[in-house]
From Swiss-Prot:
Domain of life according to the entry: Bacteria
Gene: dnaJ
The keyword Metal-binding is assigned to this record: yes
Subunit structure, interactors included: Homodimer.
Cellular localisation: Cytoplasm
Residues bound to Zn(2+) 2: C165, C168, C191, C194
Listed name of the protein: Chaperone protein DnaJ
Renumbered ranges of CXXCXGXG motif repeats: 148-155, 165-172, 191-198, 205-212
Annotated organism of origin: Clostridium kluyveri (strain ATCC 8527 / DSM 555 / NBRC 12016 / NCIMB 10680 / K1)
């Protein structure tokens, strides 16, 4: 199935503001609403489509997922394709526009006895550097709405059952016909007797007090793949709030936060590390044990290595989330210059400088001058 372009459906460019999204929806919803286009299947489908686009682009969590991945798979069960469950109340004066044409009821006319999807939940999960790099399984605790097991979600006391509302005949809505300058229109408003549920509970369940849902604490296992980083989100389908009236459950979104490491610094899938060596080893070369996320790695430092030289350890970085290889590790060489020299060290350096032609063969005055330099450096 081809992915839907929700911005294109609303006639907008990607990145449109919330205000532009609402304006576009108002215009299209008024044009394609089924009450203005009776028995027009194309108009009905178009209205469902723009309704779906609006639900995604005005939900921060869903919009962020859509903008990043271009997918419509947010809740595992798809969107409510119809328009009866849409709430126009957040459109400001738009509900009044519909009221003037269709006789009101659009802000409160949703059928409460129909299936309702549960709300999404968010959880922030803290990880150590190693857990993020190699992956881990964590158990978290969440509190959510769940179907009451005592009444099986009906809200009625055990041994009794909800009664069908005699005013709306169980539909949760009352039909009204009204004449307007545009013609006769039929609208549906929420039944004021049952509150839109379609049923009346005479003996409410004591456990849930007639709501059909209760708050529960649940332990949920979260599988964190190798290579994740701060800001990544792991969606767990169906682990959010339970739906009402047989509706699907919402989703649980795990926001990851990774603690920094004392030695390693991470950029993407690459790791950076500073390695300290003496100036003698930098000049002569040495075999160096370099810490890595897999353990120490032996690396040969060539003679004449300069401060700030960066060596690459290929494939020693962070595993990529998609499983396609690993990043690299970069080692920045820092040459430590001693601050305090003893007499033997000074003599050795003097001999080196003489041998390299940096200074003339020593005399007492020059030696005294050099000694003063080292003495000043040692302070």
């Amino acid at each position: 199935m081809a992915k839907k372009d929700y911005y294109e459906i609303l006639g907008l460019d990607k990145g449109a503001s919330d205000q532009d999204i609402k304006k576009a929806f108002r215009k299209l919803a008024l044009k394609y609403h089924p009450d203005r286009n009776p028995n027009d299947k194309k108009a009905e489908e178009k209205f469902k489509e723009i309704n779906e686009a609006y639900q995604v682009l005005t939900d921060p969590q869903k919009k962020a997922q859509y903008d990043q991945f271009g997918t419509t798979d947010f809740n595992g069960g798809g969107f409510q394709g119809g328009f009866g469950g849409f709430d126009f109340s957040d459109l400001g004066g738009f509900g009044d526009i519909f009221d003037s044409f269709f006789g009101g009821g659009f802000s409160s006319g949703r059928r409460k006895n129909g299936p309702e999807r549960g709300s999404d939940l968010e959880y922030t999960l803290s990880l150590t550097f190693e857990e993020a790099v190699f992956g881990v399984e964590k158990e978290i605790s969440v509190t959510r709405n769940e179907r009451c097991e005592t009444c099986n979600g009906t809200g009625a006391k055990k041994g009794s059952h909800p009664h069908t509302c005699d005013k709306c005949n169980g539909t949760g809505q009352v039909r009204h016909q009204r004449s307007t300058p545009l013609g006769n229109f039929v609208t549906m408003t929420t039944c004021d007797k049952c509150g839109g549920r379609g049923t009346i509970i005479k003996n409410p369940c004591e456990e849930c007090r007639g709501k059909g849902i209760v708050r529960k604490h649940r332990k949920i296992k979260v599988k964190v793949p190798a290579g994740v980083d701060t800001g990544n989100i792991i969606p767990i389908r169906g682990q959010g709030e339970h739906g009402k009236n047989g509706g699907p459950s919402g989703d649980l979104y795990i926001n990851l936060r990774v603690s920094p490491h004392s030695k390693f610094k991470r950029k993407g899938f690459d790791i950076y590390l500073d390695a300290h060596i003496s100036f003698g080893k930098a000049a002569l070369g040495t075999s160096l044990k370099v810490p890595s996320i897999d353990g120490d790695v032996k690396y040969e430092i060539p003679p004449g290595t300069q401060p700030g030289t960066v060596f690459r350890l290929k494939g020693k970085g962070v595993p990529k989330v998609d499983g396609r290889g690993r990043g690299d590790q970069y080692v920045n060489v820092i040459v430590d210059i001693p601050k305090n020299l003893n007499e033997k060290q000074k003599e050795a350096l003097m001999m080196f400088m003489e041998a390299s032609g940096e200074i003339q063969p020593r005399d007492v005055e020059k030696k005294s001058f050099i000694d003063k330099i080292f003495k000043n450096d040692s302070k």
